[in-house]
């Protein structure tokens, strides 16, 4: 045999074996691929999600390269592992706010679903059913996922849930309402949760039962059979209504996904510090006032003998306020105000219009629902909403309910008090003191002290000074010094008392009137108390003997004048005093002229307590005189009037030898009584007090009081 032939046979045999191995390899890959398709189709009938999620990770290597790529793609795009999703839901339900919002959304959806049946028997879930501690969520899987949506399925199981249900039965004769206690036993039930991302708002979460669960209900009335009315609702009917509401409802809630700004350099694992804006975590109690309730276009078929009332109900905390009955008609208005306490979870306000007949029966005509509790809403607004007719009732096509909503923040207050948005005036009384001082050429100092006391009114009453200390503001003007040329008279001091100006004014009186009537720097008449005090002081070098003689003569003349006045008022004829120490007619008439008019302000009793006593007045150096004049509003006010009795009292003081510090210009002490009458008109140390007191016009022109 040729040896070359044997080598060629071995080469061909190796090639054949290699070809057969290749065919077997390709055939094996085809079998694996077919097996994978068959398994996927078989498991697709039971749901692709659980099949993909339930297989172990080792199966990815058994199905070949293509199947592994497909399975990896499905794992990344679709199903998540059960422990991860379950941990996410468990973390969300660990937060109290999320759990409360979830329960509240469920109860709200149950009430809405119960109102859609249109039956004469209406049920309402009054309280949020608390999920028992032994409730569990298991077998969480992701069955569908896209860019903005995700569908999860889980198994919910709980032992017992207890909650009250209010049942309202409406009939043409009457309306009855009873409360029932419901005990719900929930067997393991499959729940489908839909997650949808809404741009700009957050994550919308909705859930519903995939199949009708076998619910076990126990309904018991709150009242005993003897306490209940004659017409009772069958318990089986209530059970069916509750079951239909639970199974058919699909609650939904919104979760905020907005990012919060954190300080720079914050480590994710560390606990973020408390931000300043997060300090007022506890909401303040608010109140909601309902005013000007008005129902319009109710229809003309309402009888005049019936009455309508409005009921306001708040969802959380549950509150109910009733208005007084009003006569029925096409348009009804309730004038009283209703106050409701808002809580952090208050969301809806329901207004119901009830009709009551003469026999005492009530029935629901219509109702309207308003959203409340939003911080972005204005504090006060007018709301108009349509009325939904009650079961078996027909209202007008344009039946509406109008109400004015008024929010008040902070602690509850009475109606009519100002809200927090209204700026309230300060309760601290203020007192402003203005000093105006003028120095005459002859050395006489004319000082005007104007005191303006403000006592702000709160609720129409004055605050107590003992509880609100006064705030004193002292303003002193620049002292004015009049020279010999600029003064009203360029004569000497001794002759300035005798020679007046052409209009009859004394230079000191003219300065005093100018200071009292000068409007510059005076505050507007916005306070209940305003008082001006005039102080005229000066120094004249007069011998002591002349000063004492003038004081004695003036004191004796004033006493004689007072005795004669008393005798004249008792009925006996008497002549007027021959030489009273009164003002000369010239200055008096000038002071009574319109030039010296000063508008009087209303005074309070507190002004009386602030007046200086006689001892304070007499403590001044020299001769003093105190007088009060009446003030009639919008009439002329004269600071000094003829006939005013001035009693000069002299306190013993040390004087310089040969000189006197009297306020009277007694340079002509030995002159005639008429000269002394003029000279005694103004003293250099005279304190005149003006207290404006409004008296009735019937009193006429009373004599001033000393």
UniProtKB/Swiss-Prot annotation:
The chain crosses the membrane at residues 10-30. Phosphorylation at the C-terminus acidifies the protein and leads to disassociation from the acidic cell membrane. Reassociates with the cell membrane upon dephosphorylation. Residues 31-706 are cytoplasmic. Residues 268-389 form the C2 domain. It comes from the Eukaryota. Keywords: Cell membrane, Endoplasmic reticulum, Lipid transport, Lipid-binding, Membrane, Phosphoprotein, Transmembrane, Transmembrane helix, Transport. Residues 76-260 form the SMP-LBD domain. Disulfide bonds: none annotated. One of its GO terms (cellular component) is plasma membrane. Residues 574-584 have a biased composition (Pro residues). Residues 415-706 are annotated as: Association with the cell membrane. Signal peptide: none annotated. PROSITE patterns: C2. Lipid-binding protein that transports phosphatidylinositol, the precursor of phosphatidylinositol 4,5-bisphosphate (PI(4,5)P2), from its site of synthesis in the endoplasmic reticulum to the cell membrane. It thereby maintains the pool of cell membrane phosphoinositides, which are degraded during phospholipase C (PLC) signaling. Plays a key role in the coordination of Ca(2+) and phosphoinositide signaling: localizes to sites of contact between the endoplasmic reticulum and the cell membrane, where it tethers the two bilayers. This is Phospholipid transfer protein C2CD2L. It comes from Homo sapiens. The gene is C2CD2L.
């Amino acid at each position: 045999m040729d040896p070359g032939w044997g080598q060629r046979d071995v080469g061909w045999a190796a090639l054949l074996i290699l070809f057969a191995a290749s065919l077997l390899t390709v055939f094996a890959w085809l079998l694996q691929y077919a097996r994978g398709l068959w398994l996927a189709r078989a498991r697709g009938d039971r749901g692709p999600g659980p099949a993909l999620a339930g297989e172990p990770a080792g199966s990815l290597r058994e199905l070949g390269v293509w199947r592994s790529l497909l399975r990896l793609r499905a794992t990344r795009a679709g199903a998540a592992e059960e422990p991860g999703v379950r941990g996410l839901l468990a973390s969300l339900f660990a937060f109290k706010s999320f759990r409360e919002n979830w329960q509240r959304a469920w109860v709200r959806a149950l009430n809405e679903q119960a109102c859609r049946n249109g039956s004469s028997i209406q049920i309402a879930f009054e309280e949020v059913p608390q999920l028992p501690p032994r409730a569990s969520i298991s077998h969480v899987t992701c069955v569908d996922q896209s860019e903005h949506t995700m569908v999860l399925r889980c198994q919910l199981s709980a032992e017992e849930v207890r909650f009250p249900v209010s049942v309202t039965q409406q009939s043409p004769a009457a309306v009855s309402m009873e409360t029932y206690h419901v005990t719900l036993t929930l067997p393991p039930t499959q729940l489908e949760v839909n997650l949808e991302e809404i741009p700009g708002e957050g994550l919308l979460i909705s859930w519903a039962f995939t199949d009708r669960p076998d619910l076990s209900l126990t309904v018991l009335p709150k009242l005993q059979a003897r306490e209940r009315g004659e017409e009772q609702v069958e318990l089986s009917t209530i059970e069916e209504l509750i079951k239909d509401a639970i199974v058919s409802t699909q609650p939904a809630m919104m979760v905020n996904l907005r990012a919060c700004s954190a300080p720079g350099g914050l480590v994710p694992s560390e606990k973020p510090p408390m931000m300043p804006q997060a300090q007022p975590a506890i909401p303040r109690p608010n109140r909601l006032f309902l005013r000007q309730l008005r129902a319009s276009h109710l229809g003309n078929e309402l009888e005049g003998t019936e009455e309508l009332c409005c009921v306001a109900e708040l969802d959380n905390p549950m509150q109910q306020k009733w208005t007084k009955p009003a006569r029925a008609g096409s348009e009804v208005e309730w004038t009283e105000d209703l106050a409701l306490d808002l809580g952090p979870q208050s969301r809806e306000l329901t207004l119901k219009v009830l009709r009551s007949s003469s026999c005492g029966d009530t029935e629901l005509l219509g109702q309207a629902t308003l959203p409340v509790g939003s911080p972005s809403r204005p504090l006060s607004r007018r709301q108009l909403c349509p009325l939904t007719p009650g079961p078996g009732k027909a209202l007008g096509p344009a039946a509406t309910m109008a109400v004015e909503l008024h929010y008040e923040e902070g602690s509850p207050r009475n109606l009519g008090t100002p809200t927090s948005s209204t700026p309230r005036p300060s309760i601290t009384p203020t007192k402003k003191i203005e000093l105006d001082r003028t120095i005459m050429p002859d050395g006489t100092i004319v000082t005007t002290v104007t005191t303006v006391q403000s006592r702000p009114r709160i609720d129409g009453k004055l605050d107590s000074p003992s509880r609100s200390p006064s705030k004193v503001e002292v303003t002193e003007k620049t002292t004015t010094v009049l020279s010999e040329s600029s003064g009203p008279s360029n004569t000497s001091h001794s002759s300035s008392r005798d020679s007046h100006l052409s209009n009859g004014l004394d230079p000191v009186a003219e300065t005093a009137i100018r200071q009292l009537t000068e409007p510059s720097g005076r505050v507007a008449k916005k306070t209940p108390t305003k008082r001006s005090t005039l102080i005229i002081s000066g120094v004249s070098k007069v011998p002591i003997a002349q000063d004492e003689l003038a004081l004695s003569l003036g004191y004796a003349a004033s006493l004689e004048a007072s005795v004669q006045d008393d005798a004249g008022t008792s009925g006996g004829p008497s002549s007027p005093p021959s030489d009273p120490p009164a003002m000369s007619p010239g200055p008096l008439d000038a002071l009574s002229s319109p030039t010296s008019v000063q508008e009087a302000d209303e005074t309070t009793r507190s002004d009386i307590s602030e007046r200086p006593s006689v001892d304070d007045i007499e403590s001044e150096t020299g001769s003093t005189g105190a007088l009060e004049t009446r003030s009639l509003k919008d009439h002329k006010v004269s600071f000094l009037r003829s006939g005013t009795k001035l009693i000069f009292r002299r306190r013993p003081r040390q004087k310089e030898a040969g000189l006197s510090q009297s306020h009277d210009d007694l340079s002509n002490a030995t002159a005639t009584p008429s000269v002394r009458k003029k000279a005694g008109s103004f003293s250099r140390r005279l304190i005149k007090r003006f207290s404006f007191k409004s008296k009735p016009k019937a009193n006429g022109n009373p004599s001033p009081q000393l």
